[in-house]
Amino acid sequence: MASASARGNQDKDAHFPPPSKQSLLFCPKSKLHIHRAEISKIMRECQEESFWKRALPFSLVSMLVTQGLVYQGYLAANSRFGSLPKVALAGLLGFGLGKVSYIGVCQSKFHFFEDQLRGAGFGPQHNRHCLLTCEECKIKHGLSEKGDSQPSAS
């Protein structure tokens, strides 16, 4: 009978990696798989799209407007450098404003994967090892029953 239970434990743990090879994000109960490739893909898309769709156009438009204002005489050109300092500053400000204006779009892309990312350092539960507090996690990380319990509504 003891050999049957030992064999049952081996079958149960056969699909789990050994503890020495488990990552910090491994949870035996939820089997949460963090899609790091998807996260890096979203970050790369956000960087490229924010550059091409917002930062570059804002920068070019602000530089053209500033050059036009200097040419029309509304802004004074520097005697040594001409309009270059004002145009360069306008370009930098336009670039920065373009990047900042795209933050909301990138946040909405990350919210699409919110459930998958919640255990990987995003959201209020980012310090927890598992999304679900299983018995193995409680034992492994020494979680107490007092700290994990939530107050009742009554």
From Swiss-Prot:
Coiled coil: none annotated. It comes from the Eukaryota. Keywords: Acetylation, Endosome, Membrane, Mitochondrion, Mitochondrion inner membrane. Pfam families: OCIA. Residues 1-22 are annotated as: Disordered. One of its GO terms (biological process) is response to bacterium. GO terms for cellular component: endosome; Golgi apparatus; lysosome; mitochondrion. The keyword Transcription does not apply. InterPro entries: OCAD1/2, OCIA_dom. Has an essential role in the assembly of mitochondrial respiratory chain complex III. Is also required for STAT3 activation and plays a role in cell migration. Interacts (via OCIA domain) with OCIAD1/ASRIJ and STAT3. This is OCIA domain-containing protein 2. The gene is OCIAD2.
